[in-house]
Amino acid sequence: MTYKTSLRKEKIQERDSISTKERDLAEKNTAEHFMNTYTELDFEKVSIYSPIKNEVPTETITRYIKELGKKCFLPLIDKNLNNKEMKFSEFTNEASLVKNKFNIPESLNSPLVIASELELVIMPLVAFDNKGYRLGMGQGYYDFTFKNFQLNKKQVFLGLAYDFQKTESCYPEEHDLKMDAVICPSGIYKFS
């Protein structure tokens, strides 16, 4: 078992063990940090995620973004699982969501945008380190979709995490995406 596989397993088990109360408190605190940091959201198109498996909830942040008149988009995974490049569909309401093969809610009948059109990308993660690297679920969708755009720095990559998801190193590889910041219940980590 590789270090990444072992770390992923450990952090997922830890995340799975948190209570509903802990998860709700994490959402409240994370959302407060987000709203205090992004008081005037300069981004028109924001990618958000639908949380699964006890990922940090995004409902409050999504509502805030929409109240500011901005558009939220959800990742859309291609039915051909060999195609790792995600597209993004506009999120209008919960009723429009359909679960994909990974049990992730997607908005299927909404306008699509490609990754380069997004200005703020809010991502789930399994772990993150001091340098801003993230460890995801292991499929590489975010890495593959955004790696080429990261070089132009027109997009901001933001992770949402629990404090226990911070680790010394995610042992990044060349293809791994680096985030600009991570928001946790206790505060914000910014990376240069």
Task: Give residue spans per PLM region.
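N-terminal active-site beta-alpha-beta segment that forms phosphate/nucleotide-binding
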Residues: 1-117
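Surface-exposed, charge/polar-rich loops and edge strands
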Residues: 2, 13-16, 67, 111, ...
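Short linear sequence motifs
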Residues: 42, 134-135
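Flexible, active-site-proximal loop/turn residues at the rims of small-molecule/cofactor binding pockets
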Residues: 52, 127, 188
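Short, well-ordered alpha-helical microsegments
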Residues: 55-58, 142, 167
